[in-house]
Amino acid sequence: MRYLTAGESHGQALTAIIEGIPAGLALSAELINKELKRRQGGYGRGARMRIESDRVHISSGVRHGKTTGAPITLTIQNKDHQKWLDIMAVEAVEEQIKFKRKITRPRPGHADLVGGIKYRFDDLRNALERSSARETAMRVAVGAIAKAILTELGIETANHVLVFGGIEVAVPEAMSFADIKKVAESSDLSIVNPKQEATIKAHIDQVKKEGDTLGGIIETLIHGLPAGLGSYVQWDRKLDAKIAQAVLSINAFKGVEFGMGFDMGYQKGSQVMDDIIWHETSGYSRRTNRLGGFEAGMTTGQPIVVKGVMKPIPTLYKPLMSVDTETHEPYKATVERSDPTALPAAGVVMENVVATVITKEILEQFPSDNMTDLKQAFFAYRDYVHHF
């Protein structure tokens, strides 16, 4: 499985071509649209979420509600593009139009300046448009297809926010995967403790008034994987490493950890490793899951627990200082439309990105020309693991 995305924030559309999806998977635009709607929700989102109501168009690779095994083409139109027809025109335009929304005062924390240097842009908008988090809408659409495959295999995914703008969410002890998923998805903050919602929303509102932004820490959970996905035989085949790369590829994500994560650096080995146990009906398991479902780059059969830290959105309504790239004079940075926080949406993106990596690994490890062969091989392997 592989895919490419294309498109700009204010361009005509986002596009993806996905190759390697098995034939025979039940797939509809509505299934993908439900996931896109999750991404557009969440407290603290701005005006664009009211402009855009993302809906995907499938133009290849699906016939009569089932995938054919051919490349799948997805398109999401940018409704906001109607206001940018001249500025984002493909064909050459007059000079006064060309520089109508020209950007020469890069925003700290964004791709503006470094992208302009690398690609020799005199208008930094070219870097801004492609590097925008708008692209994550298509990554969620791709993830929705990946999750459809995982669902067929009995694998579930969830995400929730652990730290919201410096406020730690008190996760109830021994909360089940099912409860985490249910409560987080019903919360417009994606948290599992409703008692903290008022406090966090007040914090978001205050930060918005200040023209500032908030980041946080998101946890993604994958439930139902067997032991043995990934490999230790080469560095680039370790599945946790692939997930880490994917998480860090999400806009504004600056760190990733599994299980106890960096807290392991403060503990002894006896307080970190997970005791191995065995039961005649379920086979091998672990008494705890401090390592987050991985050993030596392979799944252990425990739930995958991966955390990602998202920096505060760098576009500030009270901008930091910058330098004009034409005059080299100090100026306040450019202000583009932004949100005080996008943590709930980022959680949906992270969940789908991780799901895509895991699905790709499964499709590489098992026969995957069609769903019948994939399911037969996967369930046979799961049975083998239970009886090892």
UniProtKB/Swiss-Prot annotation:
It holds the Pfam family Chorismate_synt. NADP(+) binds at R39, R45. Disulfide bonds: none annotated. Keywords: Amino-acid biosynthesis, Aromatic amino acid biosynthesis, FAD, Flavoprotein, FMN, Lyase, NADP. Pathway: Metabolic intermediate biosynthesis; chorismate biosynthesis; chorismate from D-erythrose 4-phosphate and phosphoenolpyruvate: step 7/7. It is an enzyme of class 4 (lyase). The keyword Lyase applies. The gene is aroC. Its EC number is 4.2.3.5. This is Chorismate synthase. GO terms for molecular function: chorismate synthase activity; FMN binding. It comes from Streptococcus equi subsp. equi (strain 4047). FMN binds at R130, S131, S132, N251, A252, A296, K311, P312, I313, P314, T315, R337. This reaction introduces a second double bond into the aromatic ring system. Belongs to the chorismate synthase family. Homotetramer. PANTHER family: CHORISMATE SYNTHASE. It catalyses: 5-O-(1-carboxyvinyl)-3-phosphoshikimate = chorismate + phosphate.
